[in-house]
């Protein structure tokens, strides 16, 4: 499920985080329609044979808030 968050930063699938306080994390979320406008490093890649976009920033508390409700 790809979701374009309205409030940013948010992340459903957290990547790696630093040990700093607060932690600076990457997010593994991808979207077929592009990154959030605030993302300054949006990369287009292929996943499962389709083009997707991934924000490759390391942001403080990136994984603190989900973009979509937890299941």
Swiss-Prot record:
The record marks 19-20 as: Reactive bond for trypsin. GO terms for molecular function: serine-type endopeptidase inhibitor activity. Disulfide bonds join 10-67, 11-27, 14-63, 17-25, 35-42, 39-55. It comes from the Eukaryota. SMART domains: BowB (SM00269). Keywords: Disulfide bond, Protease inhibitor, Serine protease inhibitor. One of its GO terms (cellular component) is extracellular region. Belongs to the Bowman-Birk serine protease inhibitor family. Inhibits trypsin but not chymotrypsin. This is Bowman-Birk type trypsin inhibitor.
């Amino acid at each position: 499920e790809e979701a374009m968050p309205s409030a940013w930063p948010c992340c459903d699938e957290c990547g790696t985080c630093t040990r700093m306080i607060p932690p600076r994390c990457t997010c593994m979320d991808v979207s077929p329609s592009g990154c959030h406008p605030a993302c300054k490093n949006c990369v287009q890649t292929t996943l499962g044979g389709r083009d997707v976009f991934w924000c490759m920033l390391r942001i403080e508390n990136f994984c603190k808030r989900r973009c979509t409700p937890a299941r």
